[in-house]
Swiss-Prot record:
Enzyme class (EC, first level): translocase
Entry function: Produces ATP from ADP in the presence of a proton gradient across the membrane. The V-type alpha chain is a catalytic subunit.
Domain of life: Bacteria
GO cellular component: proton-transporting ATP synthase complex
Gene3D superfamilies, sorted: 2.40.30.20, 2.40.50.100, Bovine Mitochondrial F1-atpase, Atp Synthase Beta Chain, Chain D, domain 3 (1.10.1140.10), P-loop containing nucleotide triphosphate hydrolases (3.40.50.300)
Gene name linked to the record: atpA
Pfam family, one: ATP-synt_VA_C
Descriptive protein name: V-type ATP synthase alpha chain
Keyword annotations: ATP synthesis, ATP-binding, Hydrogen ion transport, Ion transport, Nucleotide-binding, Translocase, Transport
Residues that hold ATP according to the record: G227, G228, F229, G230, T231, G232, K233, T234
Length: 579
């Protein structure tokens, strides 16, 4: 089916003669066959958002409908790849087109020339259905890739073709003539089905103490990370990609500056995967859409990333989906809405911004897959509020749709406190659901310690305001002890060095032992001050400096060091009280 162009407004064009087309159908626009998607239908007129630059299009040029929705290719070869927002392989296009891509440039997302050794797990006569495992695809230098039956497909196996196969060649033939290849196509805007959702009672461990202990998120949960320029969003996301409990990382660079994305593309291949010792990129899929790319492709990029994440989830893997940033995605939505002449909402964003964000974040979750395995997609969405204003619409809509807020503070970043998570603003809605896991796996009493630490930090904020007015020396020793204990907690527990091998990640058991010792120091020093021991004498023991060095010890050495420090603390305080 084909129509003709009758109107153009930036990335949005209108074509007539497409009466049989459907919503979200992919079309090719103009003589250069630019990729587009139908977003509105009125009679035989279709409004299309074009995923490429529309300059040079002329009225009357043909528009050809494909009959298919916008879909991604899913199969062996995804890991380690870099795509744009509509899953065009950027490395292959750069080799063919050069540094600047021509309009209408198109290549299959997955390499059609590479051979994979298919080792089948089914035999003729077996009955298969969506989610069933067909076998494993292997290739030199690539991780094993399970091949599963796409959702909605059922039948009895008629023939199995093992051995060397390209991704588009039939590997399993079903009775009735249907064929299954190593790859499948899936519409990006349709969530992949699962057998059932599992309760969010297992944490998504990030390796960052401030997040795991104070603001945990469940596996399959959602978190929003607002932060202005220079607050460490990218460094935090790299730390999460490297150390978080995720088998696969899908990174969506949505609308960020070109130089920032260049840095990410340059740094990610050089990051070492601590699990395997190989490059981190080997278990990462990157979707790149810079701010100078067409806004329509930016709007589609997060759905592309989500469809890829759900595909790996259905293999029984834990997937971390990172979006940087949802603010740029919302700006693309705002521009498209303006081109469609829709009624604007707050700050010009469309009135359906909240529902679109909620619908997207609902695709996260820990599930039992159709094949009976357990998989999860955990979403971490960065937000770039102008001037760090958390009251702007994108941040507020994200907060309503997610389970945790990891707010980054410019003040902490300027003080070189990383991760610059502001504990006075951040929160989680899943702390109570995950408390049982931390009590079992980290240590009994973990929740009580966390609450005590929060109260200590809150008390420090109150005393800091008083100290700014009257000076620290005017405070009583008990109040100055609160300031000193909170300082030790901030510098020795909440702050982590991404460059220190022992401190870059922290298992829950180590974090529990550290937190227990920090708070024990505060309680016992407080008792000594109450008994008349001068605070200065306690600080002169040097035990505070030893507390700060706990973070630099490997996890296996922390219990022994904590026991020695606890004994020295008892001895020092007993000596001071006896004087």
């Amino acid at each position: 089916m084909s129509g003709t162009l009758m109107r153009m407004a930036g990335p949005t064009v209108v074509a007539e003669g497409l009466s049989g087309a459907s919503l979200n159908e992919v079309v090719r626009v103009g003589e250069e066959r630019l990729l587009g998607e139908i977003i509105r239908i009125e009679g035989d007129r279709a409004t299309i958002q074009v995923y490429e630059e529309t300059a040079g299009l002329a009225l009357g040029e043909p528009v050809e409908a494909s009959g298919e929705p916008l879909a991604v290719e899913l199969g062996p070869g995804l890991l380690g790849s870099v795509f744009d927002g509509v899953q065009r392989p950027l490395s292959e296009l750069a080799a063919r087109e050069g540094d600047f891509l021509g309009r209408g440039a198109s290549l299959p997302a997955l390499d059609r020339t590479r051979a994979w050794e298919f080792e089948p797990a089914v035999a003729p006569g077996d009955r298969v259905e969506g989610g069933a495992r067909l076998g494993v695809a292997r290739a030199p230098g690539a991780p094993d890739h399970p091949v599963v039956v796409p959702p909605g497909v059922t039948g009895r196996v008629a023939e199995v073709r093992g051995g060397a196969r390209r991704v588009d060649e039939p590997a399993v033939l079903l009775e009735g003539g249907a064929t299954l290849a190593l790859l499948e196509r899936w519409p990006v805007r349709r969530p992949r089905p699962a057998r059932r959702r599992l309760p969010p009672d297992v944490p998504f461990l990030t390796g960052q103490r401030v997040l795991d202990c104070f603001f945990p998120v469940s596996a399959g949960g959602t978190a929003v990370v607002p932060g202005g320029f220079g607050t460490g969003k990218t460094v935090l996301e790299q730390s999460l990609a490297k150390w978080a409990a995720a088998d696969v990382v899908v990174y969506v660079g949505c609308g960020e500056r070109g130089n920032e994305m260049s840095e990410v593309l340059d740094e990610f291949p050089r990051l070492e995967d601590p699990r395997t010792g190989g490059p981190l990129l080997a278990r990462t899929v990157m979707i790149v859409n810079t701010s100078n790319m067409p806004v329509a492709a930016r709007e589609a990029s997060i759905y592309t990333g989500c469809a890829i994440a759900e595909y790996f989830r259905d293999m029984g893997r834990s997937v971390a989906l990172m979006i940087d940033s949802t603010s740029r995605w919302a700006e693309a939505l705002r521009e498209i809405s303006a081109r469609l002449e829709e009624m604007p909402g707050e700050e010009g964003y469309p009135t359906y911004l909240a529902s679109r964000l909620a619908r997207f974040y609902e695709r996260a979750g820990r599930v039992e897959t159709l094949g009976g395995a357990e998989g999860a997609v955990t979403m971490v969405g960065a937000v770039s509020p102008p001037g760090g204003d958390l009251s702007e619409p994108v941040t507020q809509c994200s907060l309503r749709a997610t389970g945790a807020l990891w707010a980054l503070s410019a003040d902490l970043a300027h003080r070189r406190h990383y991760p610059a998570v502001d504990w006075s603003v951040s929160f989680t809605l899943e702390g109570d659901r995950l408390a049982g896991w931390f009590e079992r796996e980290a240590g009994d009493g973990f929740g009580a310690l966390r609450d005590e630490a929060r109260k200590l930090l809150q008390r420090e904020r109150e005393l800091a305001e008083v100290a700014e007015l009257v000076g620290t020396e005017s405070l009583q020793d008990a109040e100055r002890l609160v300031l000193e204990s909170a300082r030790l907690l901030r510098e020795g527990f909440l702050r982590q060095s991404a460059l220190d091998p022992a401190d870059a990640t922290c298992p829950p058991a180590k974090a529990f032992e550290m937190l227990r010792l920090f708070l024990e120091w505060h309680r016992r020093a407080g008792a000594a001050v109450g008994a008349g021991v001068p605070l200065r004498s306690i600080l002169d023991t040097g035990l505070g400096a030893r507390l700060l060095r706990l973070a630099q010890l490997p996890a296996a050495e922390v219990p022994g060091a904590a026991a020695a420090l606890r004994a020295d603390l008892s001895e020092a305080l007993a000596r001071l009280e006896a004087e």
